[in-house]
Regions:
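PEST-like, low-complexity acidic/proline-rich intrinsically disordered segments
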Residues: 1-15
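Cys/His-rich zinc-coordinating modules
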Residues: 3-6, 20-25, 31, 39, ...
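General marker for long, soluble alpha-helical cores
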Residues: 150, 166-168, 177-182
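Segments that form or flank anion-binding pockets
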Residues: 156-159
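Eukaryotic extended interaction platforms
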Residues: 171-172
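Serine/threonine-rich low-complexity intrinsically disordered regions
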Residues: 180, 191, 203-205, 216, ...
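General zinc-binding finger modules coordinated by cysteine/histidine
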Residues: 186-234
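WD40 beta-propeller repeat blades
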Residues: 228, 236-239, 246-253
């Protein structure tokens, strides 16, 4: 049985510890103070950037080199013997003691009948990719230098340092020679926009009297009987500073290049029908049997278990088809782990039961513990 897990389709990117300063993790975050560019039909056409948007396809010469030889597993057997009865019982007692409503008596008094070692392999392929997108962006124009002369370099010609491998990260840079000054489309170049709270009137309904002008038989003091008070949002002016241009009336527009580094992970657990829930292995460590890293890895071909070889070939082909046309594959890494799982058969109170000891941490899983008592009470 094969259990596969993939995170390739997730959209969120999380910054790694070595993500460069000035980067931001949320793809929706804007690097400036909230200014947005005017509609695309108001912007000039920049050669090489006629169609902005996601997935700027990298040039063909940016692709990784083809692997020269298949990835080979070490020439040895990968059988882990079952753990000893003493260690299995110690793990079981510790497990029972951690459950407030489990009696530790079965774990201490049980009689072992069989311990079976179950070889379970976890195959993981990581493909570290770089993708680039382009879009118009802007910031309030305060008289800064306008870089609008010269030929703009192509999206993949702009050098951007690569962060630590296999760590998600995102960074935005300004494309050189694409800047231009435009009037603010949000406020029609005025620097101010109508106050939404008072609808440009400068006054709002009195909250004290509800606009009646009176409270009972008395004239309302806060509004002096008018039922209206000065708008607190705009100070009675009726307009507020434009949030797009920050009151400048002009925007410095430019093409923004957004670079996303993403670690796309394919994980498969090759289970031999042991009856063990493999989802429990997500945070469990095993013995590393193979680590292979290259710009593009070749499927494993010599592993003793043919299911692992088949899974490796499927994963490599899938990632190549999924990312080679829209991203730049920077590095790949594949690993094979042997996760120790021992199925323990035991007898207690003349009944047979089963539990599993798994991982190098010797965790325990069982679904039919003999004695469960409800000894907890609410004081």
């Amino acid at each position: 049985q094969l259990f596969c897990f993939r995170n390739s389709d997730q959209d969120e990117a999380h910054p790694g510890p070595s993500c460069p300063a000035g980067s931001y993790a949320d793809p929706n975050t804007v690097a400036n103070d909230g200014a947005t560019a005017p509609p695309a039909d108001m912007m000039p056409v920049v050669p090489g950037y006629e169609s902005l948007g996601p997935y700027v396809i990298p040039p063909s010469d940016f692709g990784p080199t083809q692997p020269q030889a298949p990835s080979r597993a070490p020439e040895r057997r990968f059988d882990i013997p079952a753990i000893t009865e003493e260690l299995a019982q110690e793990a079981f007692i510790k497990y029972a003691s951690s459950k407030c409503c489990y009696s530790s008596k079965p774990a201490k008094e049980m009689v072992f009948t069989d311990l079976q070692s179950l070889n379970t392999y976890r195959y993981r392929l990581e493909t570290f990719t770089e993708s680039r997108t382009t879009e118009w962006d802007s910031e309030p124009y305060n008289g800064q230098v306008v870089d609008g002369f010269g030929v703009a370099p192509g999206p993949w010609s702009i050098p951007v340092p690569i962060p630590s491998l296999f760590q998600d990260c995102q960074k935005a840079v300004r494309v050189p020679h694409t800047s231009t000054v435009k009037g603010c489309h949000s406020c029609l170049n005025l620097g101010r926009s109508a106050c939404r709270r008072c609808v440009n009137s400068g006054r709002t309904q009195c909250a004290y009297c509800g606009g009646m002008g009176r409270t009972g038989s008395n004239r309302c003091s806060p509004c002096h009987g008018s039922g209206m008070t000065r708008c607190h949002s705009c100070g009675g002016v009726g307009s507020i500073t434009c949030t797009t241009c920050k009151g400048q009336g002009k925007l410095l527009c430019f093409i923004k290049l957004k670079i996303t580094w993403k670690n796309n992970v394919y994980v498969a657990v090759i289970d031999k029908g042991s009856g063990f829930p493999v989802e429990l292995l997500d945070r469990i460590s095993g013995e590393k049997l193979l680590t292979d890293m290259a710009p593009m890895v070749y499927p494993v071909v010599s592993f003793p278990d043919s299911s692992v070889n088949a899974e490796s070939e499927s994963a490599v082909r899938e990632h190549q088809a999924q990312f080679a046309t829209t991203c730049r594959i920077l590095q790949q890494r594949q690993t094979i782990e042997l996760i120790p799982i021992t199925r323990v058969h035991y007898v207690w109170n003349e009944k047979t039961h089963i539990y599993f000891v798994y991982g190098t941490e010797h965790k325990v899983y069982t679904k039919d513990y003999p004695v469960k008592c409800c000894c907890c009470s609410i004081l």
